[in-house]
Amino acid sequence: GEGGAPILLPAEPSPLPPLGSVITQTLNWERRHRLMRVHTALHLLSVVMAYPVVGGQIGEVKGRLDFHLPAPPEDIAAIETALNRLIGLGLEVSTRWITAEELAAQPELVKTIYARPPVGKGPVRLVQIGAEDAPIDLQPCGGTHVANTREIGPVRLGKLENKGRDTRRMSLNLA
């Protein structure tokens, strides 16, 4: 909204309360936390499968990333093991801000090919997984994340799907 103020919309179509009314806002924490777990797990999947990301989707119990990947990896079980190992390390997840100029000077931070971070609208939020001096993941992201990778819990990978020329889809599910 105006000046960056949040915009709240009713869950169901209904008239808005009169200006100045006292209202109660609730957050479905269980749903949000599941989304946070899946989202953070997808960050770690992009570490284990270190290929450019061309798409993705986050759901409550599952998510997916589409990778620019000409040939499929041979051992999906090894990828799942590596992913669950990273989750089990209990890595801290933190955020910090950089300028658009700093991001432009570090293009390797952007893992997505088509969904570029918004620039020209102020600072860019970075999400970091791991130690400040040696993060295992650092990329622009405006989403919600867990505070520690152990919050994710174990995950299972689905089958790798061929989604067209040089695009492979990897899905994951919360176990």
Task: Label the model's feature ranges.
Residues 1-175:
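Active-/binding-site microenvironments in catalytic and ligand-binding cores
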